[in-house]
């Protein structure tokens, strides 16, 4: 145990000056950036192992010295607004489909089928309504008043973001998620679930209660937010440049350089509206077959067999 602590202590001291400088000044960074790094720093102090040190270094370069793209920022700032337009699929609707393999969003996402993106719609659904919200019963109003088309008074919903901005942001979020799902080696969680809300049925065949459905939307949005920001953040070009300079620093010893290469092995970028693998990561893993040429995919399959 003592020898292990000494090795870890030596490894920490051998970290690049950029990393150590950021850690020493963590409290000078914006509060929203401090959280992840302080959490990892506390974990390392409580249990100083190579694994906790890697997580600390990862947090410094992927959170403290990095900035999330706009769509992730909006997801974190306006989760309730986005949840109201979040795509979903009812379990009973899957049972009614002629060929769920071609039209079920849940199945398409489970198979990493790109058609899953085409089936998405971002419309205001009927859940997560304001308190005391009531949908007018037009037939009942007509029976009582004898007037057709008369609307009852109801609470007006006010969104903190324009609906079009919400839909644009959701489109980018789901493209971001699809990129990670089809490149699992980039992810802390290797097998990602479908990002849509899956609404189940009760044993009697009816849909589950609305309050439970509300919670499904809230939980799903939080899960996706944590995954895109905390667990698998995308690097800015500046953050990538810093990591590249560290990995290529000739003064780093072999063990420390290996640690940084491990940290950088999940690097990817968001440029000009598209996601791409960073050169820092390309040497560390193989992309999903969907992103490989046919010849390369066949060669890898043959090698695997």
From Swiss-Prot:
Location (main, coarse): mitochondrion
Cell location: Mitochondrion
GO cellular component terms attached to this protein's record: mitochondrion
UniProt keyword list: Mitochondrion
InterPro entries, per database record: Gep5 (IPR031455)
Annotated GO biological process: mitochondrial genome maintenance
Family indicated by similarity: Belongs to the GEP5 family.
Its biological purpose: Essential for respiratory growth and required for maintenance of mtDNA. Required for cell survival in the absence of prohibitins.
The protein's name in its UniProt record: Genetic interactor of prohibitin 5, mitochondrial
Originating organism: Kluyveromyces lactis (strain ATCC 8585 / CBS 2359 / DSM 70799 / NBRC 1267 / NRRL Y-1140 / WM37) (Yeast)
Gene responsible for this protein: GEP5
